[in-house]
Amino acid sequence: MTNCLPTKVFDCFYGQPGTGKSECAARLVEQLYHETGKKSRLVIGDGSLLTYQHLLDAGVAEAVSFQWRIWPLDTLQKLASGWWAKDPSDPNSELVPPTAEILQVGGYVFEGLSVAAAYIMGNIKGGLAWRAGQGEKLGQDSPIRVIEADMDPKTGQPILGSGPGTKFGGNPPAHYNIAQRNMVGIIQQSQGLPARMIVWTAHEAINDPERDALVKEQIVGPEVAGKALTANIQRVFQNTLHLQSVAKRVKVDDAFTGRRVDELDLDYRLYTRDHFNASGTLMVRYKGCTRGVAEDFPQFFPSAAPGQAVLDFYAVLATSRQAKQQALTTPTPRT
């Protein structure tokens, strides 16, 4: 392995499930450990933990899952500020403030942006839907509230003893703004962590051109509690990379006839800038952004398996930036 990571990584990988977001992050954790000997911390809110199991078993990373912890806003803000589980092996261990040990942490992976926003919006204690279920009004909208009991048709109130009385809530429009603004703040807070590498992952979402005051075309970007931030959340990160699987034809040997036949397979691509669907059948723009590179920087990096292209991306990124720097320092001959 050759060294290829920049001095600072603060990037977002987004795409549909199975396109390689977590695989990219896992390979970066491996690369970081190879280059620096430092371990990484994984902040997990979905089922992606299994992707990192070999890193956990090897002691190269440790993980904290947040999706069942109460008070989502407080939990996420603390994790983005360097708080960590007192005992990472205990899924219910309390979070404690950072100590000097944090300086030995080389990287953070937040899995991820979309599930963290859904966690804020959700029904766990402290989540916005939970608050609505308790009757708490946030903003101009009335709380969406469901109580598991029979309702008195005259008063509209639950009949005592007619059901368990469990309260559930939903999300009125005001909740989306609260979740979006706080997620941006949490992402920005994480940038201050004293680690060389900070990576966020996200799922895909498509914007709503009819309601978007600035972007009047269909845009696919990272999902953050609704659609308002889909077209511009990438401005928070250094690089925003889109992962997509694309159908391709390959020649294989038929097991029964022994003949060479065409078969459909998948090419896994890591897109570095805005692009359209590879099939050419959809006029939808997928957001991507790589900063500080030459004009001839590749539009995408292909691989045969999810996540394999990520180190190629960072290696070419380093070469491209070195070329730009050299062009500035090399005198131009006069004619």
Locations of regions flagged by a protein language model:
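A structural signal for short, well-ordered beta-strand segments and their strand-loop junctions
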Residues: L42-I44, G107-E111, M197-A202, T240-H242
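A general structural signal for short secondary-structure junctions and capping/turn motifs
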Residues: N3, L28, P98-E101, Q189-G192, ...
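Conserved P-loop
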Residues: T2-Y119
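Short glycine-/polar-rich loops that comprise or flank the Walker A/P-loop
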Residues: T36-K39, L193-R196, R235-N239
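Phosphate-binding/switch region of NTP-binding enzymes
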Residues: I198-E295
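Surface-exposed intrinsically disordered loops and tails
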Residues: A85-P98, S142-I159, D253-F256, R291-F297
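C-terminal regions of RecA-like/P-loop NTPase motor modules
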Residues: N3-D11, A255-T335
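P-loop NTPase motor core
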Residues: G112-A231
